Amino acid sequence: QNPRAGQLLQQLAWFAERDLQIHAQVVICPDQNDGEALQRTLQDLAQFAGGEWPAVLSVAVVPVGLTRFRPASDGLRAVNPADAKKVIAAVEPLQKEFQTRFESNFAWLSDEWYLIAGLSLPSRASYEDFPQQENGVGSIRAFLAALDEATTNLPQSVEKPVKSSWVVGRLVEAALRPVLKRLNAVEGVELTLHGLTSPYWGQDQVVTGLLTGQDLLSGLMDQDLGDQLLLPSVMLRQGDPVFLDDMTLDHLRATLPVPIRIVHGAAEIVASALGSIEKST
């Protein structure tokens, strides 16, 4: 519906003529621009890759994100596991071709595709220097690698038993189960993983950073949350203790009957689950 969509190649040529460089993103809408259209899009973008000063440095292929706030007549639908497998099957062979041409994958699939498809994420090395991490390409893989490192030398037991709840988006829950199992093998540690949906956005499969305060209340209000609730900091606006739906962290703390700890990374999650951090933050 964008009247200038057909001008993309001319616009990229304009960038190339002026030695301007971009990292591109392709948003896939099932039945609209996947399949052969996606392959053609990536080949078109690859015309501007390679050489001493490429106009297109990398491409992220991401699924369309649909919320309940969109027009009902937009003709779009959410990505399902079959769609995800189809997109992966279309892009991975092209990555091998691009490796031969550019010594780089050039085009990367965001982590959501593999999680939606129920497949293992690619190796950390395959993301090279993570050029598209801000677009969700490799961010979960990097987080899993950090969790693996943080749980490498766990103690056999903890001095004081600690029962915790850890909240994540439903989409990443299954990928975190091995880490949960390792932590719960420590005597005295009881960690429950809550993979939540988002009634606020109208999404069943959601990443952790999109969970809102209302989603947390909806999913946790009647749960046994133990001694503490671990909330990843990505749920809050940067530098501001407010969720995406404008609910404040103070309001959540006043409503849920459990101490809430904001955790800022893999090492802090593990330390909190082990009871190694005393003061709630």
Residues covered by each model-derived region:
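Aromatic/hydrophobic pocket-lining residues that form the small-molecule binding cavity
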Residues: 8, 38-41, 84-87
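Catalytic cores of alpha/beta
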Residues: 33-47
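Charged, low-complexity, helix/coiled-coil-prone segments
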Residues: 17-34, 161-164, 189-197
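Core AdoMet radical
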Residues: 1-16, 21-33, 52-64
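Hydrophobic side chains in well-ordered alpha-helices
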Residues: 8-11, 41, 176-179
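Charged helix-capping and loop-helix junction motifs
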Residues: 6, 39-40, 244-248
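Auxiliary Fe-S-binding modules of radical SAM enzymes
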Residues: 48-55, 60, 66-281
